[in-house]
């Protein structure tokens, strides 16, 4: 184990400490479920029945924001932590996933089996960075798309998640899904198809009952715009959770009790408390990787405890324009051999990450390394 890791508590010790927060409340979980579903129904009702177009557009955007909120709660329910009982958690997760077309069975396999215990490695995953050689080997259109994805713009997050993750891994079973899981996954795909047909039918019939709304307008404002706003939310959340100049990615075997500890490979993005509350504290991410049975309504306090125990080894960033511009400017490509981030032209933007885990395990100061070269 590198000397730097001796200066912080062991993973086992930290899990034991934060386990006190892993307490589910069925009443609280059901209340949050009812609130999220109620907010979504209210937003869609606003699209259908508010009189002015600008009001309908506002309701559509809010519906997409609520879908982002629902994703966080569904994520927790899929970890079986928002209420007591496995079956009820699974039911709530399936219901919450359906309006934004997530296949519950695919999510459980990909997220629980592939991502959660093994983040930041070479398998396909959200925002896995290209090496310089990989990037240079891409066709010109794909290089341009990667530049678009990793620029600080909301459209990039939405387009990335829609094309690279949602459509290809969250709706129908991909080729890598184990054979024994495929029947259940296809049944869930059928559920999504039935829901989609019914919902689109409801929107297409809007001229019969809605206020000042054609069928096309209803589909655009009730279906297309909310889903794209959701894609933006999901793309942004998944980008910031594992992308940071202090965060390493690994090829080959890595010791998940040492330099590959999951709580050291994810970011705690400190957001204003109203934003944290609205999104069920999805940005308190490291402690979720450490102990996924902690429900969203306790995760902020658990994350605060973890940050205090990790000290300067914790990866903590404050939400803001300066943080976003710095991160997106520096985290373009990754040198998988020397563990440092690069610009698209191959210029390093950080020192090798292993070098900052010296002595007391202090992390690279955000924005400090090689600033003159960027």
Question: What is each stretch, according to the model?
Answer:
Residues 73-91, 119-131:
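Aspartate-rich (DDxxD/NDxxD/DxxxD) Mg2+/diphosphate-binding motifs
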Residues 49-74, 91-105, 223-231, 267-281:
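Membrane-embedded alpha-helical segments that form the functional core of polytopic membrane enzymes
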Residues 70-79, 107-120, 237-246, 278-294:
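Histidine-centered catalytic micro-motifs
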Residues 90-96, 250-264:
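Membrane-cytosol interface motif
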Residues 65-74, 103-107, 154-167, 223-252, ...:
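Transmembrane alpha-helical segments that form the membrane-embedded catalytic/substrate-channel core
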Residues 1-64, 97-224, 297-374:
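Non-catalytic, topology-defining segments of multipass membrane proteins
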Residues 78, 183-185, 268-272:
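Active-site-adjacent structural elements in folded domains
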Residues 277-284, 300, 325-326:
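A structural signal for short secondary-structure junctions
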């Amino acid at each position: 184990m590198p000397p730097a890791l001796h200066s912080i508590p062991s993973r086992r010790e930290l899990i034991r400490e934060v386990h006190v927060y892993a307490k589910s409340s069925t009443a609280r979980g059901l209340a949050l479920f009812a609130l999220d579903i109620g907010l979504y129904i209210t937003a869609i009702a606003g699209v259908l029945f508010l009189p002015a177009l600008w009001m309908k557009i506002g309701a559509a955007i809010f519906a997409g924001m609520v879908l982002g909120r629902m994703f966080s709660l569904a994520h927790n329910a899929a970890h079986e932590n928002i209420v007591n009982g496995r079956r009820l958690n699974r039911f709530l997760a399936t219901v919450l996933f359906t309006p934004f077309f997530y296949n519950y069975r695919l999510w459980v396999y990909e997220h629980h089996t592939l991502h959660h215990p093994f983040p930041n490695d070479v398998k396909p995953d959200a925002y896995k960075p290209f090496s310089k050689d990989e990037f240079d080997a891409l066709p010109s259109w794909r290089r341009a798309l990667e530049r678009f994805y990793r620029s600080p713009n909301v459209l990039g997050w939405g387009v990335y998640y829609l094309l690279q993750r949602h459509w290809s891994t969250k709706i129908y079973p991909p080729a890598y899904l184990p054979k024994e899981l495929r029947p259940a996954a296809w049944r869930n795909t059928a559920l999504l198809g039935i829901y989609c047909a019914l919902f689109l039918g409801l929107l297409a019939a809007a001229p019969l009952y809605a206020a000042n709304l054609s069928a096309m307008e209803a589909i655009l404002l009730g279906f297309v715009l909310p889903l794209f706003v959701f894609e933006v939310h999901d793309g942004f959340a998944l980008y910031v959770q594992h992308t940071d100049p202090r965060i390493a990615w690994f090829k080959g075997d890595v010791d998940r009790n040492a330099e590959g500890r999951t709580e050291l490979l994810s970011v705690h993005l400190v957001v204003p408390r109203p934003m944290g509350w609205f999104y069920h504290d999805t940005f308190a991410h490291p402690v979720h990787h450490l102990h996924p049975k902690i429900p969203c309504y306790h995760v902020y306090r658990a994350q605060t405890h973890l940050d205090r125990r990790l000290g300067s080894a914790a990866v903590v960033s404050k939400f803001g324009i300066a943080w976003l511009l710095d991160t997106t400017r520096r985290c373009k490509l990754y040198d998988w051999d020397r563990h440092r981030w690069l610009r698209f032209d191959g210029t390093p933007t950080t020192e090798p990450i292993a070098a900052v885990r010296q002595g007391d395990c202090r992390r690279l100061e955000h924005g400090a390394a090689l600033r003159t070269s960027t």
